[in-house]
């Protein structure tokens, strides 16, 4: 069997609205720029040495209909005025021969920043726990990311939040880490 180790990853997000939940999900994927692919959800490992690239650069490497492995956070509602959010957090180790973590989070009533920071902290804590150092993990106000002395290179997040605007209309938010196998 071929080694399916992704070498690149990009992050994206989207918001969609529609008459049905499925339509709103499709529109959220379109907004995120990934509706033209066959999406397969995978768990939360950022592969060793995977290069983080821009969405635009990542999309240039893909073909419509291609099977696309993603860590996908998704949330939907048709409740008027309901705030929904989804977020992906990531933590990259300093030792790039070690794997990192991707975390997905979806919630109701959280702002984009709240959802994003929750997902980012979750990824950082998962990575720190694999090193037996979860208690040493700290937020660095200057760098605006979680740090673990010489162990975590960077943490970030991407989030999408919106409010259901119309009665009887479905709204979906997505955030995704798209893993590219070259």
Curated annotation (Swiss-Prot):
A GO molecular-function descriptor: arginine decarboxylase activity
Q: How does the cofactor attach, per the note?
A: Binds 1 pyruvoyl group covalently per subunit.
Give the superkingdom in one word. Answer: Archaea
**EC?**
4.1.1.19
**Site keyed Cleavage (non-hydrolytic): positions:** 43-44
Please provide the Gene Ontology terms (biological process) for this protein.
arginine catabolic process
Q: What keywords would UniProt list here?
A: Decarboxylase, Lyase, Pyruvate
Chain positions found as Pyruvic acid (Ser)? 44
Annotated coiled-coil positions are: none
Q: Which reaction does it catalyse?
A: L-arginine + H(+) = agmatine + CO2
The UniProt record lists the keyword Membrane: no
Q: Which cofactor does it need?
A: pyruvate
Instruction: Return the Pfam families for the record.
Output: PvlArgDC (PF01862)
Under InterPro entries, the record lists: Pyr-dep_his/arg-deCO2ase (IPR016104), Pyr-dep_his/arg-deCO2ase_sand (IPR016105), Pyruvoyl-dep_arg_deCO2ase (IPR002724)
Looking up HAMAP family in the UniProt record yields: PvlArgDC
Name the family the entry cites: Belongs to the PdaD family.
Please state what the protein is called. Answer: Pyruvoyl-dependent arginine decarboxylase
Q: Which organism was this protein described from?
A: Picrophilus torridus (strain ATCC 700027 / DSM 9790 / JCM 10055 / NBRC 100828 / KAW 2/3)
